[in-house]
A protein has these predicted regions:
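Lipolytic serine-hydrolase domain surface
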Residues: 239-354
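Short N-terminal segments immediately surrounding and downstream of signal-peptide cleavage
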Residues: 52-72
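Catalytic-loop region of hydrolases
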Residues: 71, 77-106
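A conserved cap/lid and substrate-binding interface adjacent to the catalytic center
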Residues: 97-202, 220-226, 250-251
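Serine-dependent carboxylesterase/thioesterase catalytic core
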Residues: 181-273
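Structured beta-strand/turn binding interfaces of compact recognition modules in eukaryotic regulators
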Residues: 76, 121, 132-134, 232-235, ...
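N-terminal signal peptide
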Residues: 38-58
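Classical eukaryotic N-terminal signal peptides for Sec-dependent ER targeting/secretion
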Residues: 1-37
Length: 356
């Protein structure tokens, strides 16, 4: 097991170097600021829509305990000290659900400050690849998020004609050492633990977008058969054709959205984007459990990726604007802090979250 530092792009692709993220940034940044301002005003000026998705018998059930296991793993990748992740001594590494995790690699790509870790979970009997989400105090990550130029899918995926993806997200995975090091870890894990293990690729926020491309990579380029993508608060990453292409190959995909989280509303559909399925909309019922945490209604949505009875229909024009809702999933705050302090935090903004 090791901590890997990466500085240089690993793959040469036309017009896809990470520094290209800074070109045309002014226009993209201005567009996103306007969009964000409009979303905030619309939400503050109106009452959130009351949306209820009725249970449908042929939809899969939602495993809450399994979901919390995945969320716990996503809290770890926000720890700043890679050595403590490597040795599994970080402040949240001793949570009961994940304390048996065996780390293979901790990956930090310095040019864009992207972080991930990989390893084996005995309790899940699975290889797990976890990608970190956006850090608000790091402008480079926000530049990636704010870049709205779509690119043709450049990896040689069969049948991907017409599939277009978010340029910043795609380049971050495909043109840096992150991709190479993750795939090297996958090979080591198979050599050590066997080739019959399930593979779980997960991430929160920006990490969910990177996890989406990683899952496709493992499926198509490396013939991984038992594969699940499990994202939390992921943005949209591609267009309608990408949605179709993705689900032609990936059958096991869960995309959890918490309440009125702003990030899954972006980039908006009017720019040509379409969410992958299957959404699980985790709604605060405004009731309280005996432990003081909210009672959640975890609604399994349809397989369209854009179920109007789920988060799509919860806010005016489909654009939600809650930052605090982006910081907690399944009643677990996604932060590298004390593992049992959920009730003690009240994050009013992204900035206050980062100070914890």
């Amino acid at each position: 097991m090791k901590v890997t530092e990466s500085y240089l792009p690993a793959i040469t692709m036309r017009n896809t170097k990470p520094r290209k993220l800074f070109e045309s940034f002014g226009l993209a940044f201005a567009n996103w600021l306007c969009l964000f301002a409009v979303a905030m005003l619309l939400t503050l000026a109106s009452t959130k829509a009351s949306v209820v998705a009725e249970a449908v018998e042929d939809r899969p059930s939602f495993d809450l305990e399994y979901g919390k296991h995945i969320v716990d793993l996503n809290t770890v990748v926000y720890c700043r000290d890679g050595n403590k992740i490597e040795t599994w001594t970080c402040p949240v590494c001793d949570k009961p659900r994940i304390k048996d995790f065996e780390v293979d690699d901790v990956i930090h790509e310095f040019e864009l400050n992207i972080m991930a870790f990989t390893g084996y979970s005995p309790s899940l009997d699975a290889f797990v690849f976890v990608f970190r989400g956006t850090k608000s105090d790091d402008l480079r990550n926000w530049i990636i998020d704010l870049s709205v130029l779509e690119l043709d899918l450049d990896l040689p995926y069969p049948g991907s004609n017409g599939a277009k993806v978010h340029g910043g997200f795609y380049r971050t995975y495909a043109t840096t050492h992150v991709r190479v090091l993750v795939l090297e870890s996958w090979a080591r894990l198979r050599a050590k633990y066997g080739t019959d293990k399930k593979v779980i690729v997960t991430g929160h926020s920006l990490g969910g977008a990177l996890a989406t491309f990683c899952a496709l990579d493992l499926k198509l380029q490396h013939n991984e058969t038992d594969l699940q993508l499990y994202t939390l608060g992921s943005p949209r990453v591609g267009n309608d054709n990408f949605f179709t292409f993705f689900h032609n190959w990936i059958g096991d995909s869960i995309r959890v959205v918490n309440n009125y989280d702003i990030v899954p509303s972006l980039p908006p559909t009017f720019l040509g984007y379409h969410h992958i399925a299957r959404e699980v909309w985790s709604v605060n019922t405004n009731k309280t459990q005996p432990d003081g945490l909210p009672v959640l209604n975890n609604i399994v949505c349809d397989d369209s990726g854009e179920d109007e009875h789920c988060s799509d229909g919860a806010c005016l024009f489909g654009i939600c604007s809650s930052i605090p809702d982006h910081m907690t999933y399944l009643n677990i705050y996604i932060t590298c802090g004390q593992p049992q302090d959920n009730k003690k935090h009240n994050f009013e903004s992204l900035e206050s979250f980062q100070k914890k």
